[in-house]
Amino acid sequence: MKAELIAVGTEILTGQIVNTNAQFLSEKMAELGIDVYFQTAVGDNEERLLSVIDIASQRSDLVILCGGLGPTDDDLTKQTLAKYLGKALVFDEQAGQKLDAFFAHRKQAARTPNNQRQAQLIEGSIALQNQTGLAVGGLITVDRVTYVVLPGPPSELKPMVKNELVPLLSASHASLYSRVLRFFGIGESQLVTALEDLIKHQTDPTIAPYAKTGEVTLRLSTKADNQALADERLNRLEAQLLSIRTVDNQPLRRLLYGYGEDNSLARETFELLKRSGKTITAAESLTAGLFQAQLTDFAGASQVFNGGFITYSIEEKARMLGIPLGELQRHGVVSSFTAEQMAAQARCLTNSDIGIGLTGVAGPEALEGQPAGTVFIGLATKNKVESLKVVIGGRSRLDVRYIAALYAFNMVRKTLLKSENLL
């Protein structure tokens, strides 16, 4: 099945907004086994939109239009598609009731006749209800081409696609099953080199690498009749690729940290801390609280985290953590000594099981003779204090700080796994 995406809105063409909907929709279509062959952006102009719809209908089986469902005169997507299909617009009662409820609770908002446009639907369409907005979407098939209209705001489009559109399309198309593997400690080029033969000769299942900031993911995908058959194929491919070694002779299995599109090193570490009943603290310099902020993104963070420290200057490291100022000056702020002392003192002061210390040079200038990107991470438990030095070269200040936090999470993750004899 060939799909085409049409983004409607002059603001896209003028660069005022980025069309993130195209990426989201392409991913969702791929999960359904639907191939997106074309993506188009067109302004709020009926003549040009009619032309784009006509071209799409001649070469695609599924045409998805995003945007232009609002109440103003330049919101003309449904009106233009209805004109192209020779269909009338009808009023959707459920969407109309939502309009009534919205304005009933907002006396200060004046309802105008134009608002009725948001509850209109092309005659013969299946309504796609809007859980987070007012404009109803729709799906209609005419002459073997299926047309879908969706709202433009991602906060409205995404729930509509997940909860309304995907179930409809899933019922009529073969499914694509995917599994996302997440790796840390290896770059995309190194990973692709290690998997060169597998990628070169892939058919089904397929392997798709994606570079993220500081990490790499692999999406394994297969088209199958059911989940059990898909799992069998994906398990076989996963076992094969995880047994492969990198150019420096590391098994890829050791670099895999988790699964899932929305997973992260922070989440994996948080779950391990919860499972083991351990608590953690951190004293941060160059990351300025980033490690602690990511850790507390998850509900239940208070079970594993009581508090921590941001000690940016050398004086605050001495004052807040009780590290002798003379020792800090002698060893330098950017050093294994300082990272280890930060971790150990933070652990003792908060009575935590694990302490992390982060210090380094975010850049762009060097510090204490250390180049930008030099990071020392200390880790303290009741039994040991250790540190790791990493050099995150060629990155922005923001990336250095973010990747430094990733290394810290990975250090904690590996420590917890070793304590459970799982690494």
UniProtKB/Swiss-Prot annotation:
GN (gene name): cinA
Organism in which the protein naturally occurs: Streptococcus equi subsp. equi (strain 4047)
Organismal lineage: Bacteria, Bacillati, Bacillota, Bacilli, Lactobacillales
Membership in a protein family: Belongs to the CinA family.
SUPFAM superfamilies membership: CinA-like, Molybdenum cofactor biosynthesis proteins
Protein's name according to its UniProt entry: Putative competence-damage inducible protein
Superkingdom in the source lineage: Bacteria
